[in-house]
From Swiss-Prot:
InterPro entries: AAA+_ATPase, ABC_SmlMolc_Importer, ABC_transporter-like_ATP-bd, ABC_transporter-like_CS, CysA_C, Mo/tungstate-bd_C_term_dom, P-loop_NTPase, Sulph_transpt1. The gene is cysA. It catalyses: sulfate(out) + ATP + H2O = sulfate(in) + ADP + phosphate + H(+); thiosulfate(out) + ATP + H2O = thiosulfate(in) + ADP + phosphate + H(+). The lineage of its organism: Bacteria, Pseudomonadati, Pseudomonadota, Betaproteobacteria, Burkholderiales. GO terms for cellular component: ATP-binding cassette (ABC) transporter complex. It is an enzyme of class 7 (translocase). It is a peripheral membrane protein. This is Sulfate/thiosulfate import ATP-binding protein CysA. Belongs to the ABC transporter superfamily. Sulfate/tungstate importer (TC 3.A.1.6) family. Pfam families: ABC_tran, CysA_C_terminal, TOBE_3. Part of the ABC transporter complex CysAWTP involved in sulfate/thiosulfate import. Responsible for energy coupling to the transport system.
Amino acid sequence: MSIEVRGLSKRFGAFRALDEVSLHIETGELVALLGPSGCGKTTLLRIIAGLESADAGSVLFAGEDATDVDVRQRQVGFVFQHYALFKHMTVFENVAFGLRVRHRSQRPSEARIRAKVLDLLGLVQLDWLADRYPAQLSGGQRQRIALARALAVEPRVLLLDEPFGALDAKVRKELRRWLRRLHDELHVASVFVTHDQEEALEVADRVVLMNAGRIEQVGSPREVWERPATPFVYGFLGDVNQLHGHATRGVWRLGEVALPAPDLPEADNQRAIAYVRPHDIDLARAGTAAPGIPVRLNHVYLAGPSAYLELARQDDQAIIEAQVPEPLFRSLGLKEGEALLAQPRRARVFAVQP
């Protein structure tokens, strides 16, 4: 079942949580709502679920208006960050809960409930824990049980609010791969909220970047990473250097450094910022003929196959971060305190708004 929101707006007092947000999610699609705290992503998820009401706009499921439909009638599965499992119930009873509290006319028989629960526990690979209590489970196991409980009522859509946020890094990585595989089996429209860039880029079919109650960009993980639409998206997704210069007729300049600025073909000495990833910066020793930004090597740390360099510009001491392959770093024989030239190889240039 598809999900569509049209012109959603929501305020909490003077705070604007959502500002005319519109989005369409296809059946079977796994979409990540990604952004910093306070950007509106959880509010949007809760309005889709029916846990919050919008001040304006509408929510549609499969093309039908569900804006005023009660949360109990929306057939939405919701997974919270902190599991919300019933401590006094076993794993089996937790998963069966949504089925057992249905109205008598819709409630399955106990035999069907048992079969359904055991099927779901098998799906999340935890059928051997059916008789245990939540306190006897690890964090990753609890989250999988919470997901099984959400699926028990056969939701038309699945919503997850930072489902792995309370788990350690290794468990998060394992569970998000598992969620991707599980989603491919279920083929329902699923939306999950996260502030973890790696999580969104690894798991989702599409990523929705949100900022200050608005959508900045929607696209596949590859699209938003390789072609950020706005300075916010560029700055939010991964590490980036911001180099302030000027653009004229499609060329950005800072001192002797010149880079293409195809988005600014009509610029005339306009202030502009070049966004440069650390791995897109080459290094040369000071005194070479090649153009570059004069810097001094402040600090180096090695992590796996890469060397990460902190460079201080010699004009204003602003920091530039560079990332080079560890073998290349060793072959260059660079030393902390050495004068170098930072040479941006590739950048995306945005005009500074007046």
